[in-house]
Amino acid sequence: AEISRDKSGFFRLEKILPGASWSKSLRSPLAEPGIEAKVGEFIVAIDGVPTNSVKDMYSLLVGKADVPTEISLNSKPQLEGARKIVISPLEEEYSLYHYNWVQDNIKKVDKASNGKIGYIPDMGPEGLNEFSRYFYPQLDKEGLIIDDRANGGGNVSPMILERLSREPYRLTMRGGSVRIGTVPDAVQVG
C-alpha cells in the first residue's frame, strides 16, 4: 500500500495494490476478502499503538511479516470510532508492485491492439515458469510482445524460441462453424 502522513500525525491510505490471492508472495493484505480497507482511510493504530505516536509507521511492523497483526482503521484521523482488522503484513512489496506493473501492461497492450496482441513480461528468476504462466493463457493472440528489458540473461531464450516455433498438432472445428482453433471451446466430463 502507499501511505502518507496526515497533519494529524496519523497515516492515510493513498493506494491499495490489488493482489493475487492464489500466490502467497502476491497477496495484498489490505485487499483480501473481508478486510474492506479503502483508499482515504487512516491507519490510526497497529497492535494498539497509535500511529501518531511514532515518526515512521513501518517501525510498528518490524518483525510482523506473516504474523497476524491488528490494524485500526478510521475514515477520520482519530482513534475514536476506529474499526479493527487483522492482517498478516508482507515482508516486502516488490513482487506485488511488479505483478501490478505486469497486469497494467497486459491491459494496455490488450486495449491498444483490440485484444489481438498479448504481453509477456521480463521473466525474472523464475524464467520459463514465468513465461509459461503468461504465454499459455494468450495462445489465441495473433502476436506477442515479449518484454525482456529487465531480463538478466541466461539460457531461457532457446527454450522460449522452442515454445514459440511449435506447430499445432491438431485443430478443432465445430460443425457449421467457420472458427478453427487449437484448443477446445468446451470439455464434457462424465
Regions found by a protein language model. Name each.
Residues 1-25, 111:
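PDZ/PDZ-like peptide-tail recognition elements
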Residues 20-30, 44, 49-190:
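Cleft-lining beta-strand/loop regions that shape enzyme active-site pockets
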Residues 40:
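Conserved catalytic motifs of ABC-family nucleotide-binding domains
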